[in-house]
Regions:
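Generic alpha-helical structural context detector
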Residues: 69-73, 82, 147, 169
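His/Glu-based metal-binding/catalytic segments typifying zinc-dependent metallopeptidases
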Residues: 12, 23-78, 216
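Charge-rich, well-structured scaffold segments of protease-associated domains
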Residues: 1-22, 38, 56, 64, ...
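Catalytic cores of enzymes that engage adenine nucleotides and/or redox cofactors via long glycine-rich
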Residues: 28-32, 83, 109
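M16/MPP (pitrilysin/insulinase) zinc-metallopeptidase core fold and M16-derived inactive scaffolds
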Residues: 74-90
Length: 228
C-alpha cells in the first residue's frame, strides 16, 4: 500500500530545485473535420482507421467513454469483434480505442482487411456506430462492460509500475490523488442513457475521418457511405 501524502513528504525536498513553470494558457482545441484520406501502397491488406474527436482527460464523461469503447471494440465480446471478425470473417484484427489528452482527445477504430472487402468492412463499422447512436445498450451489455473495466483496473493495480504511473498521472493531470475505489464507483454509476448521449455526440458522420492504407485508389465509394 502506498501512502500518497507520506511519499510526497519524503520525496518533495529532492525536487525543491525544480521550479514549476507557467501553464499554457493560449490553447485552441482542434476542431476535427471529416474527410477520407487514401495512402496507396501495394499491400496484401488494407489498413482502415475511422476516427473522431474524443474527450479530454478532465471531461466528466470519460468513464462513460471508457465503457462505450469497451462495448464497441475493447475486447473479444465487443460488437465490432463479434460482427466484423466472428460473424463475417472480414478481419483478424479489429478494435476500437480512446486517446484522451489535456484539452481534447480522439476515439478511433482500426481493422485490416482484404482490399476487395474494404468497402464492405467500412460500411459494417459505420452500421455499428449507427446502432450505438440509435438506442441504449442493454443492461446485460452494460453490466459486462462495467465488470470488465473493474477487472482491468484491479489487475493493473497489482503492478508496482502501474501504481507509480497512476500516481504520476494523478499528480500531473488532476492535481490530486484519485483512489481506485473512487474510479470504480464512477464507472459503476454510468447509465445506458449516458452512453447513448455520448455516442450521439461523438459519432457524427460529418466529423468522422477515414484513412485507408493499402491498395485502394478510389475514395469516392467510401465518401458515399460515410457522408451520404
Amino acid at each position: 500500500n502506498v501512502d500518497h501524502a507520506y511519499l510526497i513528504d519524503r520525496l518533495g525536498p529532492a525536487f525543491d530545485s525544480i521550479k514549476p513553470g507557467n501553464d499554457i494558457t493560449q490553447r485552441v482545441t482542434p476542431q476535427g473535420q471529416g474527410r477520407v484520406h487514401l495512402n496507396y501502397q501495394d499491400l496484401q491488406q488494407v489498413h482502415i482507421c475511422v476516427s473522431t474527436p474524443g474527450l479530454s482527460l478532465n471531461d466528466p464523461r470519460r468513464y462513460a467513454c471508457s465503457l462505450l469503447n469497451t462495448i464497441l471494440g475493447g475486447n473479444m465480446s465487443s460488437r465490432l469483434f463479434q460482427e466484423v471478425r466472428e460473424k463475417r470473417g472480414l478481419a483478424y484484427s479489429v478494435y476500437s480505442f480512446m486517446m484522451p489528452h489535456a484539452d481534447t482527445g480522439m476515439c478511433g477504430i482500426y481493422l485490416a482487411v482484404d482490399p476487395a472487402k474494404a468497402l464492405e468492412a467500412t460500411a459494417l463499422v459505420l452500421e455499428e456506430l449507427d446502432k450505438l447512436c440509435a438506442k441504449p445498450v442493454s443492461a446485460a451489455e452494460l453490466k459486462d462492460a462495467v465488470e470488465y473495466t473493474k477487472g482491468s483496473l484491479l489487475l493493473a493495480s497489482e503492478s508496482n509500475e502501474n501504481q507509480m504511473v497512476r500516481c504520476a498521472q494523478n499528480e500531473i493531470n488532476f492535481k490530486r490523488d484519485i483512489k481506485l475505489q473512487e474510479v470504480i464507483a464512477l464507472v459503476e454509476s454510468v447509465s445506458a442513457a449516458e452512453i447513448l448521449e455520448l455516442a450521439k455526440s461523438l459519432f457524427v458522420r460529418n466529423r468522422l475521418g477515414l484513412t485507408l492504407l493499402g491498395s485502394v485508389k478510389d475514395k469516392g465509394p467510401f465518401e458515399d457511405i460515410l457522408y451520404t
